[in-house]
Amino acid sequence: MRNIIVEPLNQTPIEDQKVEIVERKGIGHPDSISDGIAESVSRALCNAYLDRFGAIMHHNTDEVQITAGESAPQFGGGEVIKPIEILLTGRGIAEVDGEKIGLDRIAISAAKEYLRDNIINLDVETCTVVECKIGHGSGDLRDVFARKGRAPLSNDTSFGVGFAPFSETERIVMEAENLLNSPEFKKKYPAVGEDIKVMGLRENDNITLTVACAMVDRYVSDLEEYLEIKNVVKDEVFKLASGITERNLEVFVNTADRCEDDEPSVYITVTGTSAEMGDDGSVGRGNRANGLITPNRPMSMEATSGKNPINHVGKIYNLLSNQMAADIVESIEGVKQVHIMILSQIGKPIDHPKAATAQVILEDGYTMDDITGKVSGVMDAWLEDIPSITEMLVKGQLRTF
């Protein structure tokens, strides 16, 4: 019997609160690059372990540090003067029953592949230096297969949190960044780089969006063209947001620009990321497991990217909580808003947490008796199927930032 608790949440629903703040750091932000590299290295190791040994061995690659380079962007195309330095750290199994695996090679290759796929104007070979300092350990397959068919044991006493549904402001912030960094948008407007941050502020029924968007200098001939692209970004974000909300909208783009000065200062880059010129990055310093930073909502400070997907509850429970919450809202009539909290106890099976709690705000006309059993059922089913979280992570089907 799992310890599942369902209780009413005595709180003003998010859409009725007077002030709401939401942030998303796009995939080209240095903190998000660190998250993306960490997770891609973990996923590459998982698949290498499965191919070689038939099981995922212990590892954590959630310590990626980006030290910014130096660049000289200019209209028409500038240059990277000093490369971006990327340090991969953490720990991983490099030898199993006397058989070695190329851990460093796999990690560096995964990091570079991630950069090529996601920061498309970055010359990975000449503009980055990737160094691997992941600690090496050894493993025993007998220990791994001894637990086959049983839930892994929690690596820590930790908790995960999630919520659903997204508010209008949360949807707008998430979808605006996704739009600007979509392949279709990049093909149409190649000057728009990947380093995009969207900050949303809702004051009652007025939503203000502030977008920071790195432009790629080689695709921008002069200040006039730069301003044209800024207007495109503004108009496209406004159009997207208007399809989500009927609230009043205002969109600002690159508000630090100084276009009227004798020597204009604008946000142009050589590569599309500010990591090229002074902005460092670290894992876990940006988006939470659901892709947003939401001070109005419950959040965990745990970084999810790069942690092992087998028994690291700081990763698994945060992702599981969000899956649970979304499922509850979508499948159970009468649930207006739900917060999920799951607490582990070190050394105990991860499918039997110390506590799994759902805090629920109901739609008008419903009682807790109407939904408690159904909510418990959804949570119990997800805990029973917790290996599916691991499977989705290994296949790259779950967002971790």
From Swiss-Prot:
The molecular function GO annotations come to: ATP binding; magnesium ion binding; methionine adenosyltransferase activity
Instruction: Provide one Gene Ontology biological process annotation.
Output: S-adenosylmethionine biosynthetic process
Pfam assignment, any one:
AdoMet_Synthase
Q: Which reaction does it catalyse?
A: L-methionine + ATP + H2O = S-adenosyl-L-methionine + phosphate + diphosphate
Residues annotated as binding ATP are: G135, H136, G137, S138, G139, D140
Q: Which cysteines are joined by disulfide bonds?
A: none
Describe which pathway this protein belongs to, using the record's wording.
Answer: Amino-acid biosynthesis; S-adenosyl-L-methionine biosynthesis; S-adenosyl-L-methionine from L-methionine: step 1/1
The EC number(s) attached to this protein equal 2.5.1.6
Keyword annotations of the record? ATP-binding, Magnesium, Nucleotide-binding, One-carbon metabolism, Transferase
User: What domain of life does the UniProt record list for this protein's source?
Assistant: Archaea
The family database entries (InterPro entries) matched by this protein are listed as: AdoMet_synthase_2_family, AdoMet_synthase_3, S-AdoMet_synthetase_arc
Write down the required cofactor(s): Mg(2+)
Q: Which family does it belong to?
A: Belongs to the AdoMet synthase 2 family.
State what this protein does: Catalyzes the formation of S-adenosylmethionine from methionine and ATP.
> What is the protein name stated in its UniProt record?
S-adenosylmethionine synthase
Question: Per the UniProt entry, what species is this protein from, by scientific name?
Answer: Methanothermobacter marburgensis (strain ATCC BAA-927 / DSM 2133 / JCM 14651 / NBRC 100331 / OCM 82 / Marburg)
**What taxonomic ancestry is recorded?**
Archaea, Methanobacteriati, Methanobacteriota, Methanomada group, Methanobacteria
